[in-house]
Amino acid sequence: DTIAMLGAAASGDLDVLVLLGSDPLSDVPDADLAERGLAGAGTVIAVEMLPNASTLAHADLVLPAAAPTEVDGTFTNLEGRVSVAEQKVTPPGTARADWMIAAELALRLGADLGVESPESIRAEIAAVSPVHAELTETALADGRVEGVLISGSSIEAPSVSASTTPANDSYSLRLVAARRMYDNGTMLQASASSAGLAASVKVTLNPADFEKLGLDAGTVVKVISGRGELMAPLAADFGVPAGSAMIPANAPGSNANTLIDASASVTDVRVERA
């Protein structure tokens, strides 16, 4: 529970916060909470391949992690398909696999995770995860289909109780924070071929809302919520529901997470001419 952990850190109740390939300042929906959490933690340890905003501003210790092509392991996608990843190159310098770093960190903090190899980790995953119950070393070695093993277990959607959200005010729009394929992500920006593909932030509304606001596409506006504000040009898209404002998360220039309070079920915003 990322929000709960950051809340505990912000309150001074978390002695050590470990960031495993994580950039809370950019990725957590509530930027204010992320900042307070990182600042309030006793010690921040980052396990990272590349520097990011959170590690540069708050990490007390950075442990270099190996890239996926530098370690052995498996990947599980949302369909339950398990792909085998084999080490292609040697990690540079002192970089190590995430599980090695986690095991040694645990020992330094007084706990033994009992893992010594990727095989021992897969055995534990198979023991605790029904989806991976058939994930044996034999299945991985003999049951590949074009490099992919499909788990025999089905994934059931968790039951979630319905919650009520407050109604829109007559002057407000409901914020939709959207993810794009290309953004300010650490690995994307570290690649010269993909760094320039992230589009700058725009506030996208349904054309039906433009007349109500007295604004036109291309107008630079200020978007205000109870948490913060940002400035960006307007854009029109019939795909955005009327009464909503779509703003990309972690886009160059501004981030929708500056507007969001993670403790609230929804975020309503006001849009006005800048």
Descriptions of predicted regions:
Residues D1-T94, I101, R108, R122-A274:
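A cross-kingdom feature strongest in bacterial/archaeal respiratory oxidoreductases
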Residues L113-S120:
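Flexible, glycine/charged-enriched surface loops at secondary-structure junctions
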